[in-house]
C-alpha cells in the first residue's frame, strides 16, 4: 500500500528499485553529501488547509495583481493586450493538441502537424515571404537566430542593428553573438527611426546583415524600401523584426525584399502572462530554406495518394546533425503556435485587417487627444499602435498614480535611454474604448 495518499509508489516498489541499483536505503543515495550540510530539522510548514480554504487564500493573493480585464492597459513595448477569441482556449485544451513539442511520428500526429502547417502558411502570407518555420521561443530569440543565419550564410562576422530595435531583443542578439564571436554594432536612432546616414557609413564588406524593426520600438514605421536598397547594394542581408498584426495594414517586409522576417505572434491568441511564454516566428526566402532553424512541416501524399503532413528537411536539425545543426533550438512553442493559428483563422483575413485598423485608428485618436491637451508628442504620425509622450514627472511615479485609477500606464522609456527620461511609450489596441482613452489622457493632465 502507498505511504502517501497522492503518491502511487508503495514500500515494495521502493524496495525493488533500491535493490536494482544496489543500495539499502534512500539515505544511501545521498552519501556523497557531507553530513554537516544535510538538512535534518523538521520543515517549518504551516498546517494543511482544506481545498476551499486554499482556493480562497490563493484568490485573495491573485486579486492583488493588476490585470487587463479589470484595468485599462496602455502598456505595450512588445507585449500587448489584444482580443483572444474564446475558441482559442477550447481548442488548445484538447488532449490531442495539448503539447509544446513538435511530433516526430506523422502517422499518429496528422492533426497537430496540419495545425503547424497552417501556422507556417499564415505567417508566410502575412510577412510576404516564401516560407516560415513551425515557431521559435519568442521574438527576441528569433531575431538572434536570424542574425546567426545571416553570419553563417554570408561568412561574415559583423551584424548591424538599428538603435530603434527593442532593447531587450538587441540584448538577446548580443548574448548570442558573444558565443559565436560575432561583432554587433548599433546604428543610432534619430527622431525615432534608424539614422540613415550613420547606416551608410557603417556598411562595409564585412557586414553580414542589418537588423531593423518594423514598426520599431518607438512605434515608428521604418522606410524599408530605402533600407533594403542600401543593405543589398552592400551584399548584406536585410533582417526585419515585425509585429505580425501590423502587417494586416502595412506592406509586408517580403514585398520590400527582406531576406529574413522574424517576430512574435503573442498578438494572436496569447495572453500577456507577465511576459511569457510567447511564440516567435521565422520566415525566409527560398534561397535560405535549408538554413532555417527549428522544425519545418511540409505537405505531401501517402502511398494511397492522400494528403499528409510530415516534418521535412530534418537533416538541418540537432537530432540528426548534432553539433553541426543549423541551430540549437529543439522543443519549441507548438502549443502557442496553435493558439496563434486558431486566433488568426477565427479572425479571418477580414477580421485581421479590421483588428489592425482599430489599433491604427484608436492610437491615432489618442495621440490627437494628447496634442489637443497640450502634451508634447514625439516623432511623426507614421506609426501603427504606439507613440511617445513626454511628461514632466517620472514615469514610475505617474504609473503608480494611474493604477489607483484602474489604468495600467505606458512603458518607461527612461529605463533604457537616459535621453528619454520622463517619456512614456503609449500602446493603444483594439481593446481600448473611447471613454478609456479620454480618461487616460485626463488622468495625465497633472503630469503634462
UniProtKB/Swiss-Prot annotation:
- Signal peptide range equals none
Query: Which CDD domains does its entry note?
Result: GDC-P (cd00613)
Question: What is catalyzed by this enzyme?
Answer: N(6)-[(R)-lipoyl]-L-lysyl-[glycine-cleavage complex H protein] + glycine + H(+) = N(6)-[(R)-S(8)-aminomethyldihydrolipoyl]-L-lysyl-[glycine-cleavage complex H protein] + CO2
What's the EC number here? 1.4.4.2
Q: Which UniProt keywords apply?
A: Oxidoreductase
Which Gene3D superfamilies does the record match to this protein?
Aspartate Aminotransferase, domain 1, Type I PLP-dependent aspartate aminotransferase-like (Major domain)
| GO molecular function per UniProt | glycine dehydrogenase (decarboxylating) activity
Highest taxon above the source species: Bacteria
Quote the subunit structure annotation.
Answer: The glycine cleavage system is composed of four proteins: P, T, L and H. In this organism, the P 'protein' is a heterodimer of two subunits.
Q: Which PANTHER family match?
A: GLYCINE CLEAVAGE SYSTEM P-PROTEIN (PTHR42806), GLYCINE DEHYDROGENASE (DECARBOXYLATING) (PTHR42806:SF1)
Family according to the record? Belongs to the GcvP family. N-terminal subunit subfamily.
Q: What does the protein in this record do?
A: The glycine cleavage system catalyzes the degradation of glycine. The P protein binds the alpha-amino group of glycine through its pyridoxal phosphate cofactor; CO(2) is released and the remaining methylamine moiety is then transferred to the lipoamide cofactor of the H protein.
Q: What name does UniProt use for this protein?
A: Probable glycine dehydrogenase (decarboxylating) subunit 1
Question: Which gene holds the coding sequence for this protein?
Answer: gcvPA
